[in-house]
Amino acid sequence: MSPQTETKASVGFKAGVKDYKLTYYTPDYETKDTDILAAFRVTPQPGVPPEEAGAAVAAESSTGTWTTVWTDGLTSLDRYKGRCYGLEPVAGEENQYIAYVAYPLDLFEEGSVTNMFTSIVGNVFGFKALRALRLEDLRIPTAYIKTFQGPPHGIQVERDKLNKYGRPLLGCTIKPKLGLSAKNYGRAVYECLRGGLDFTKDDENVNSQPFMRWRDRFLFCAEAIFKSQAETGEIKGHYLNATAGTCEEMMKRAVFARELGVPIVMHDYLTGGFTANTSLAHYCRDNGLLLHIHRAMHAVIDRQKNHGMHFRVLAKALRLSGGDHVHAGTVVGKLEGEREITLGFVDLLRDDFVEKDRSRGIYFTQDWVSLPGVLPVASGGIHVWHMPALTEIFGDDSVLQFGGGTLGHPWGNAPGAVANRVALEACVQARNEGRDLAREGNEIIREASKWSPELAAACEVWKEIKFEFEAMDTL
């Protein structure tokens, strides 16, 4: 190295390791409308100051690395770096903090949830300075939202396609989830749809197994849909699961569904991946298919309360990537979901504008700038006695999905569907008449059961079934 080169290097670059907080902790920073904002729950290792931990998150999820590098001088770090601009302790928790991080929009590829998550929830989650890290919420700026198509159709377009208004939609997951032949599977679909349900559903792990190949299932389910439509005069659907081992195979299944003339297909968006999901959502919009989304694997990511990612973030990501329905818990069934927290991300799925509300776990005001909404699906351990609570909690713009609560009826599948439809119609009518579903729910169901033997039988079977456990979420 020449003396001249040595002089320039010594002036422009100083090698070594320095604290992240010297560069990435900027409490005076004023956030921009175009920034992506993140709220992380940070648990530092013993001896690591919270400022250093928050700055480390900002650095490792944006432009930083473990040591100073000379190529930092070839760009403007001030323009591209993430910034930890706020810290607050978590009430009731020892050594946990909410770290607020702002990311410049130029860090992210347009229209790519995959790229956004690769940065924000990538390698930083394995960082040694942190005992645990959880992404609680994201604020997606309107400038970035406008680069996404979002849901293929949205709530209003779906209602218009189905010609169904003023009530939640009713669904049922076909059980047993694995093992039925395609013909017997189609028979169960037909019986449920004929009995009064709007939709039936493939279970999330039904793809194309030796006992039932996908093409056979699609054909028998299409026959069931058209037969039940002819008999009831209502538009029906079955969520045909197009999830597959490759994107090419997934698209082939979606194309076949469109050729059959069915109204809706399905995708497991977390196991299938956001790239595949966005591709399928684009195809569904272009070809008039509704898209039902299942969240299989979500609890691996969101169940631990100090590490991972809250489902509200996955819900926002799904609205960007695309889906007309997504499973969102029940509050009252067998799967975990605290009421206020669940309603917080349900509103984030459906509404155009949601105000910051920490009591519901919403850390940032979110403006969706007319991106279509997503119907939340309540599913998991629910039955007719839950109908008043579900109708009150989720309102009209939702799908209430009863699997065992339909197919477990003592008289069979069609009577199980009748019982659910009668219970729903009774609850909607009572609500419209001004009755209090929370207080009078059981009475409303009993009154309706006097005129419906199917509902009376269902009420008797499930009168003692409850799923009561302590909620785990903390704000």
UniProtKB/Swiss-Prot annotation:
Principal subcellular localisation of the protein: plastid
Location of N-acetylproline modifications: 3
Entry comment on modification after translation: The disulfide bond which can form in the large chain dimeric partners within the hexadecamer appears to be associated with oxidative stress and protein turnover.
Propeptide feature ranges: 1-2
Note: The basic functional RuBisCO is composed of a large chain homodimer in a 'head-to-tail' conformation. In form I RuBisCO this homodimer is arranged in a barrel-like tetramer with the small subunits forming a tetrameric 'cap' on each end of the 'barrel'.
Protein name: Ribulose bisphosphate carboxylase large chain
Chain positions found as N6-carboxylysine: 201
Positions carrying N6,N6,N6-trimethyllysine: 14
Any one GO MF annotation of this record: ribulose-bisphosphate carboxylase activity
GO cellular component, one term: chloroplast
Catalytic function, reaction form: 2 (2R)-3-phosphoglycerate + 2 H(+) = D-ribulose 1,5-bisphosphate + CO2 + H2O; D-ribulose 1,5-bisphosphate + O2 = 2-phosphoglycolate + (2R)-3-phosphoglycerate + 2 H(+)
Gene coding for it: rbcL
